[in-house]
């Protein structure tokens, strides 16, 4: 009995250790986004609350918490209230299988990739329920767009994952990272470059970020699926979007960029200099790079038209992944060095 209680307490501690830094990261990702986009647009960005505006995320949180929650008169009130949780929970529970370093993982399951793919697919239900329950044409349009977009890009994303599974020979995320040992030239992003790019683009579309933010489409359908939300409901949708961004960036780093592995493995003089850097620091640096590109893309590219979005998913990304899956299978059978 005491042993079981001890295990439960340990699991709860690990969950807290993962979730609390994640929520803080989400808060400061919003700050980083406003600063980066401000710099790109030759503006200052938030700089009033705290030193250099560093307390701005907490001011935003306080504002959203204290706002009134308005439930539309003819909406389905029960579904309207719980929809943000349907969107948020999948973006948090996906972290259960993420290895931050060798052995540092909440649940080291052998089907980690499959679990992650399943969790990333569930977020769209929150968007769809929110759009339908709001009883608003703008919200419903946004929800339908998001559903079609997710279905389209998940196929390409799934095929890209199959390429990694072929190359690494495992669905365990720790094994996938360990299969990339030997330095930067052994990472999967080199032999699987088209799949890496497809997964990256699909990840941006999956999180409804610009230039694939048709589910929100401020200039077309006001704010899309969350047009009727205010206060904490809006904050939860906001939180789920940014948590999903961090999760997709982490998965990219693990599957294609060596996870916590140093890029200087095998280069003796550099390895001797950087061997003191812990593995999770390398992982954080890679995640930060992908997040910066998320922000850079938002500030740079205009929104796609809906037909362009569908055409890109079905006529470009899916054919590319199918072709490169065949190429990957040939490389695996032929044992192309140094990767296979």
Curated annotation (Swiss-Prot):
It catalyses: a quinone + NADH + 5 H(+)(in) = a quinol + NAD(+) + 4 H(+)(out). It is found in: Cell inner membrane. HAMAP family: NDH1_NuoH (MF_01350). The chain crosses the membrane at residues 4-24, 78-98, 113-133, 151-171, 184-204, 244-264, 273-293, 316-336. NDH-1 is composed of 14 different subunits. Subunits NuoA, H, J, K, L, M, N constitute the membrane sector of the complex. PROSITE patterns: COMPLEX1_ND1_2. NDH-1 shuttles electrons from NADH, via FMN and iron-sulfur (Fe-S) centers, to quinones in the respiratory chain. The immediate electron acceptor for the enzyme in this species is believed to be ubiquinone. Couples the redox reaction to proton translocation (for every two electrons transferred, four hydrogen ions are translocated across the cytoplasmic membrane), and thus conserves the redox energy in a proton gradient. This subunit may bind ubiquinone. Belongs to the complex I subunit 1 family. It comes from the Bacteria. Its EC number is 7.1.1.-. Keywords: Cell inner membrane, Cell membrane, Membrane, NAD, Quinone, Translocase, Transmembrane, Transmembrane helix, Ubiquinone. It is a multi-pass membrane protein. One of its GO terms (molecular function) is quinone binding. This is NADH-quinone oxidoreductase subunit H. NCBIfam families: PRK06076.1-2 (NF004741). GO terms for cellular component: plasma membrane. The keyword Cell membrane applies. It is an enzyme of class 7 (translocase). One of its GO terms (biological process) is aerobic respiration.
């Amino acid at each position: 009995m005491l042993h079981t209680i001890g295990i439960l307490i340990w699991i709860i501690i690990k969950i807290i250790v993962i979730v609390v830094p994640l929520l803080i990261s989400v808060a400061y990702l919003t700050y980083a986004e406003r600063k980066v986009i401000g710099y790109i647009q030759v503006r200052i960005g938030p700089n009033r609350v705290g030193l250099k505006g560093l307390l701005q995320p907490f001011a935003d949180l306080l504002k959203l918490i204290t706002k009134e929650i308005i439930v539309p008169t003819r909406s389905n009130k029960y579904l309207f209230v719980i929809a943000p949780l349907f969107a948020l929970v999948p973006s948090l529970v996906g972290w259960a299988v993420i290895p931050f370093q060798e052995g540092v993982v909440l649940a080291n399951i052998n089907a980690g990739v499959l679990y992650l793919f399943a969790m990333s697919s569930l977020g769209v239900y929150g968007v769809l329920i929110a759009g339908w329950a709001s009883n608003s044409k703008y919200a419903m349009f946004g929800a339908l767009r998001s559903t079609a977009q997710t279905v389209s890009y998940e196929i390409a994303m799934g095929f890209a994952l199959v390429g990694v599974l072929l190359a690494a020979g495992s669905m365990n995320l720790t094994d996938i990272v360990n299969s990339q040992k030997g330095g930067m030239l052994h990472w999967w992003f080199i032999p699987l470059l088209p799949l890496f790019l497809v997964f990256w683009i699909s990840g941006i579309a999956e999180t409804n970020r610009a230039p694939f933010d048709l589910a929100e489409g401020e200039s077309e359908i006001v704010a899309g699926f969350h047009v009727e939300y205010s206060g904490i409901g809006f904050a939860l949708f906001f939180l789920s979007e940014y948590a999903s961004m961090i999760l997709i960036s982490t998965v990219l780093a693990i599957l294609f960029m060596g996870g916590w592995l140093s890029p200087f493995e095998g280069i003796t003089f550099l390895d001797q200099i950087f061997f003191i850097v812990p593995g999770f620091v390398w992982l954080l640096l890679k995640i930060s790079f992908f997040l910066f590109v998320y922000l850079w893309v938002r500030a740079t590219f205009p929104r796609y038209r809906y037909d362009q979005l569908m055409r890109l998913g079905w006529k470009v990304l899916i054919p590319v992944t199918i072709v490169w899956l065949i190429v990957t299978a040939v490389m695996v059978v032929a044992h192309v060095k140094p990767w296979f």
